[in-house]
């Protein structure tokens, strides 16, 4: 450990970072009994989510499309059993996929895979992996090209009437079922493949339900295609983006204009999809890629959960006449201003953190993708050198709050919901759910960093004392 604070404040490039990973967390194929720490309520919580996730998705969709965005409840004098049968009948009539729905769903997957293998991109390396004796896996990143080639192709198909994009909303229940089935099927196949064929499993508890949920493999691949990275960017956020783009095209076709409310949601979803695409190589060195296993939780949520629950602001604006959400000009302008300000902090904070990681690893390559915003890269950033050889950034936006990118991220989600007003609870699902997720992740990260850095983390917190909101939280 450095003797005093002045020795911990270093200028970039003064020291060489060790390429050997630090084993501060359990490693190996099987966890020892004293290493097992169940998250999400253990087996009971996992069973609840395996059943609850799809049921919640169906219920939210039914309320959005068939109950005018209201919470569906039994009518006066209607029994709960009759009510549940009615909901089930709606799923049978409107949520069972036909061949056309599977064609739409799988064609998108196929083209995303083809584009991954064929479009230009850049190569980068992940973190040193303990189970591979410090080896860094190569990652090919071309999501930026993929996003805009896919957008061009989709618009050509739409305007030539070969495929009207808003069909994915008109057949929402059926296509969502395709995603739910695929999420379960892919998770089961990958888990069994890992256990019995590849044997590339890690940190298993021996509780198959829990291990299935959390995942068995760490970095499953099809050649150069890393499944975890592929699922994290292209399937969820591109799908959400195209759902909203379809809604905009429908409004333009129906009314001759796109409402300011749907416009701000479209801007938000494009900004987010674009941010994930342009920063794909910056996802590579994150905790999720280096240590999070790839199981049902990540697979299902990326295939089905994210695109088909986070889109309820879009569904509300699509299913309702614009007269039902006619806000004042000041309110509408405020939504755009708050969104763009939040995005600026979200983009630049993440860029500062990830550029610092690249600098410390000796990677001096730069990539200026649109939009390249001021203050994305810190020159000669201040940082701490910990006793285990790691570097902690104590400069830029992170001196204001350690999770300032979470705050900015959540603020964007708040704008999504505010665009719809308060007549339906379902557009508010994402910001409420996301707030819980971010708080859980923040405290999980706090505990992880405390274990990893020890007293160095206490020193770091003196430099960056706030978590979410400067001088408040």
Swiss-Prot record:
GO biological process: ergosterol biosynthetic process
Listed pathway(s): Steroid metabolism; ergosterol biosynthesis; ergosterol from zymosterol: step 5/5
Pfam families hit by this protein: ERG4_ERG24
N-terminal signal peptide: none
Cytoplasmic side: 65-101, 158-174, 250-326, 440-473
Transmembrane segments: 40-64, 102-123, 139-157, 175-197, 233-249, 327-346, 415-439
Enzyme Commission number(s) of this protein: 1.3.1.71
Record family assignment: Belongs to the ERG4/ERG24 family.
Note, other: Present with 1640 molecules/cell in log phase SD medium.
Name the record gives this protein: Delta(24(24(1)))-sterol reductase ERG4
Species: Saccharomyces cerevisiae (strain ATCC 204508 / S288c) (Baker's yeast)
Gene: ERG4
